[in-house]
Each structure stands twice: as structure tokens, then as C-alpha cells.
Amino acid sequence: MSKLFSEYKLKDVTLKNRIVMSPMCMYSVENKDGIATDFHFAHYVSRAAGGTGLVILEATAVQEVGRISEFDLGLWNDEQVPALKKLVGGLHYHGAKAGIQLAHAGRKAVLPGEIVAPSAIAFDEKSDKPVELTKEAIKEVVADFKRAAYRAKEAGFDVIEIHAAHGYLIHQFLSPITNRREDNYGGPAGNRYKILSDIIKAVKEVWDGPIIVRVSATDYAHGGLQLEDHIPFAKWMKADGVELIDVSTGGLVNVAPPVFPGYQVPFADEIRRGAGIATGALGLITRGEQAEEILCNERADLIIVGRELLRNPYFAKDAAKQLGETIEAPKQYSRAWK
């Protein structure tokens, strides 16, 4: 059997294969209330039907002010739980495990009214200037991640991912470009890591399942985070109880990274080796052979697929065929699953 289609354990959760649907914002909550819609059900469940092992839902805001846009999913109140519970049931029906990415946009929120950040520095000249979070407000953010994690548990999710990448709030705290604080949340790396550590520990108070953290392994900017900065971060995350790091890049500043097949895989490889923690690799991974090479050469433990799964919900089926594997079809589709 290929490694791509071998089982993988995240704590006590067993994935049927190592293909993960990357969290990708769909901006499709038309009522602006954070509640998942029929679109979300069809979108995510179709990828589970296609054979994906773990489906991670898009950035789901823990505070209303933490949305990237008004059209984002949310878990800041109990009314948002039932629709997600139904969606999780659909994922489980097709044998996929269900993950959710808990997030706060910070200064990258595009919303009416006040937005917040670790320091009062706008994303760019076209963006609103955020208000610097007080220590009390930071503690409330941490508490809201905990509350959202509890709601995720109530909805039946198997995995929680904490979004600490792509220039959103936690990433803003981690990077010296966006964190100019002079208190115990700013300055040295250990201080800048504090909010993420506090969030992980708070989530663990109500959640005993696996925790993944998504990071941006480089800011692609002078004075920003580089790969070597993430080795100690990853070691601290491991000590705090994180199971796996989902390794992306960029998003903190408005710069286009160099993009080519597998362009982010070396970052996952280096963090895996440098910190001794499991990683997920992503970045233009589009074929089964490519994914298999990454796993067999121990460059990562999971394959996180984004845009290819938008193009092709049956990526797992096609990857299996490329690797000479056969995977079980949904019974409703078995007559055509060749």
C-alpha cells in the first residue's frame, strides 16, 4: 500500500488516509450571521464523498470582530452550532474526519467599525488602522478561543486547528513587524508566543482531541519571521500539546511569494526535523506521485490539499489511480467508480 493511503493517527483520531482538505475561506454566509449554509454542506461533504481523509473547515471566527469579512463562518455564539453539527454528520457519513479552523483576523478584518491588533499598525495604506488590544482584551480573545473550542466539541468535530498564519491576529503577535508591544506580549520571541501558548492551553481545558496549528514559516519580508524563528516556536507548541503543524507561508505583508509545485514543502520538512514534531505539507500539491514522494522521503506526515480540491473533489480517487491503488467508493457512486 502507498503511504498516502495508509492510516494516520492524530492523538486518538485515526484518519483513513493522509489527504487533508486545507481550510479555505468561501465568503458564503449570505446572512452575515456566521451560520453555515446549504452551500457549506454541499461544498465540504462533496470532498468527503470524494475520499478525503480529513476535511478542515475554513477560518471560523471566535469573535464577531475577528471575522475576515462579514461573510465568514463563526463560532462566537451557540446559535452557530446546529448547522455545523449537521455538516459534521455529513462528513462522518462518508468516512472523513471533521476539523475546524478557529481564527481571529485582527488587523486584516474588513468589517464596518473598529478592528483590533497587537499594535496600531495598518496592513497597508488602503486598510483601516486597528486599535491596539489591551491586556484585558487579549485575555478575552483567549477566552473566546476556549468558548469556540467547546462549541466545536458540541458540534462533533474531531480535530481543531488554530490559525496562527497568513497575517491574522496570532501571526500578528508572533511577528516583530506587526508586534511593537512593550509589555509581556511583545519584544522577545517568548513574549510574542505568549498569546498562542495561552490559547492552546485554554483550548485544552475544554478539548481533549488533537490540536493542529497553522503557521506561516516565513513573512517574505525584511525584519519579519524566517524559517529559523519557527523551530523554537514549534518546539514550544509541541511542549504545549500540539499534535501537528500545518506549514504555510506569507500573508503578513502585501507581497507575492515565489510559487511553484511544492514550494512550501521544504518549510514543513525543516520544521519537522528541527523541532521533532509532525507536519502537514501544502503548496501546489496536485498529483498522487508528488504527494507520495513527500511522505516516503519523510518530508511531512500529512498532505494538505487546497486549490486542487476546489478543482477536483475526487482528488483522492484520482491520486489513488495514479498510485495503482483502489479506494472504496461511496455506495451511491460505485457503478461509475472505476
From Swiss-Prot:
FMN binds at S22, P23, M24, C25, A59, Q101, R214, G306, R307. Its EC number is 1.6.99.1. GO terms for molecular function: FMN binding; NADP binding; NADPH dehydrogenase activity. Gene3D superfamilies: Aldolase class I. It is an enzyme of class 1 (oxidoreductase). CDD domains: OYE_YqiM_FMN (cd02932). It catalyses: A + NADPH + H(+) = AH2 + NADP(+). Keywords: Detoxification, Flavoprotein, FMN, NADP, Oxidoreductase. It holds the Pfam family Oxidored_FMN. Its cofactor is FMN. The keyword Oxidoreductase applies. One of its GO terms (biological process) is response to toxic substance. Substrate binds at Y27, H163, A164, A165, H166. InterPro entries: Aldolase_TIM (IPR013785), NADPH_DH_bac (IPR023663), OxRdtase_FMN_N (IPR001155), YqjM-like (IPR044152). The keyword Flavoprotein applies. Signal peptide: none annotated. Catalyzes the reduction of the double bond of an array of alpha,beta-unsaturated aldehydes and ketones. It also reduces the nitro group of nitroester and nitroaromatic compounds. It could have a role in detoxification processes. Belongs to the NADH:flavin oxidoreductase/NADH oxidase family. NamA subfamily. Homotetramer. This is NADPH dehydrogenase. It comes from Listeria monocytogenes serovar 1/2a (strain ATCC BAA-679 / EGD-e). The gene is namA.
